[in-house]
Amino acid sequence: MIHRVSFYGKTTWFTKQHLIDWFLCLGIFVIESVLFNFVIPPFKRYEPESNISTNTFQLVQYPLLPDIVPVWLLMLIALGLPMVVFIGYYIKNRNSHDFHHAALGLFQAFTITMLFTDILKVSAGRYRPDYGARVATGIEAVIREGRVSFPSGHSSVSFCGMTFLSFYLCGKTKVFLKDGGNILKALVCLCPFMISALVAVSRTVDYHHDFSDILAGSVIGLSIGVFVYFMNFNSLFSKECSLPKNRINPHYARDGLLSAEYQSLSISSSL
């Protein structure tokens, strides 16, 4: 039996800065959730008093329907699904370094995405397509939700989590290296994008967003997912693409530990 040598046992990678990152992300998430949901009201746009036949107001007269993808399911997709993959990979390889950076990176991406999305939502104050039906309910919380259409939070959050997961899979399958990938690897790596695209499109089907809302949200989530992934993992085009970064020893891949890390982070070539 070949003994797997974990990189975690070879060198130190965890620093005080990682703890600071965790607490900062948690603090930012809590503060922005309170501020933009309970303290800061959305920008109040002009509402025609009587002439609801204007082109602008005709666009917000769609029926009020339940979410096709409720918030709990969105969180399960954007955060739960990647975590299942990270945990499964940890169980297989026993690499704490990789698991920590994957979990931290996902939380960082989620926090930054929520911050950007909520700031833009209250700043734009755009009416949802079902705003008229929300006003008819007379419920203040429902009406308020009708004024935060741009950008789509479902789109930004789903693309954030799925982009991070897709890049994680690309790194582990080494799909961009010189020897190339295959159709199965490509499908595995691209599957998260299809999931996030379906979540985004569902927001137009239930009349909670326009296409411009979901497009903006998708760009935000995708951009932040890519940005944060490369904060924590190496380039997908390098030989170290499957490895997490190391703040204590940035050049650990050149210091004789790379073979041990590769052995710890190996993935089946049968994909």
Swiss-Prot record:
> How does this protein lie in the membrane?
Multi-pass membrane protein
What GO molecular functions are on record for this protein?
phosphatidate phosphatase activity
- State where it is primarily located: membrane
GO CC entries: membrane
| UniProt keywords, alphabetically | Hydrolase, Membrane, Transmembrane, Transmembrane helix
Q: What InterPro entries does the record tag this protein with?
A: P_Acid_Pase_2/haloperoxi_sf, P_Acid_Pase_2/haloperoxidase, PA_PP_rel
> What's one GO BP annotation on this UniProt entry?
phospholipid dephosphorylation
Query: What are the subcellular locations of this protein?
Result: Membrane
Ranges annotated as spanning the membrane: 23-43, 68-88, 102-122, 150-170, 181-201, 211-231
Q: Which residues form the signal peptide?
A: none
Similarity section: Belongs to the PA-phosphatase related phosphoesterase family.
Q: Kindly provide the name given to this protein in its UniProt entry.
A: PA-phosphatase related-family protein DDB_G0284367
